Structure formats: C-alpha cells, structure tokens
Amino acid sequence: MLHWGLDQEKHPVFIQVPGGPVRHAKGPVRKSYDDLRSEVVRRGSKIAIFGLGSLFDMGEKTADILRESLGFEVTLVNPLFASGLDSELLDNLAVNHDIFVTLEDGQLEGGWGQTLASYFGNSDKHVLNYGIKKDFYDRFEADKLLHENRLEPGLIVADIRAALRRCAN
C-alpha cells in the first residue's frame, strides 16, 4: 500500500502508522488500489466476517473459532477501505451467505458497519455490527472497553450462534 501511495498521482493519500503490530502479507502484495475492492481472505459459506482496519485480526480469530466449532469455513473479508462498500462483492456473497458480521475499531453509530447493514436493509440477511458505542471515553482500560462492546472473539461467536438459530426458524 505504501508503494501505491508513493506512486499514484490522482488523489491525496493518508498514511497512518499502525497502532498495533504490523501485519505482513501472506501472499502476493496488491500494487493498485485504484479499484476499491475488498480482499476475500477466506472463502466459505453462510457467514461473512468483515474485519475493518485493526480489527481484521479479531475477525480472523473469530473465523478460526467458528471453523472449529461449526465444522465449516466462513468467509473472511478485509475491506481495505472505509470510505464505501464493495457492492459487487456484497451481491455475490448474498447468494450463499445469511449472516454478515462487521468489526470496526471506531464508533458504531454511523460507522462503516451500519452502512453495510443499510445495504441489506430490505433483504432477509442478518447483519451483526460491532464497534465502540458513542460516548466520551476519558480514561479507560482498552480490554474492558472491548468487552463492554462485545468486541471479543468468544462473545462474537456466541452472537453468531444465536443469529444462526434465528435463521433456522
């Protein structure tokens, strides 16, 4: 992404220093971000998890737990950008997915996940959004704040299992 940011001349580029550990690519590195498409990291069915930004790793851990406990692979997506939706991907996933899960480290209300939820607003899809509730946080323990907002793989898995039961009815 850094190479792309240095080479492209069409738009301004914002480069942010990672707040957590650097995630190294496991495969070929994407060289163009002109086409704002999300990256499907794992292909599965029934459940699609979108881990935006620093919460991609949490999405990966959640997908691992689901694979072990449910016995099938779920789809894991790295959205790569928060300024819009990859509607082509969403339409393709809607064919064989019933539950869409969004994880973001920003404010839940009015965030990227709620934009995705509104995309499926008139459908039979279930969307679970996770982020930080709107509030003023002066001093806080990060782990406690994440727990209070159900931003832990085990809690997310419990919510997904409940959504699966609702889908079955």
Where are these regions (language model features)?
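Internal gly/pro-rich beta-alpha loop/helix module
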Residues: M1-D7
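Thiamine diphosphate
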Residues: D7-N169
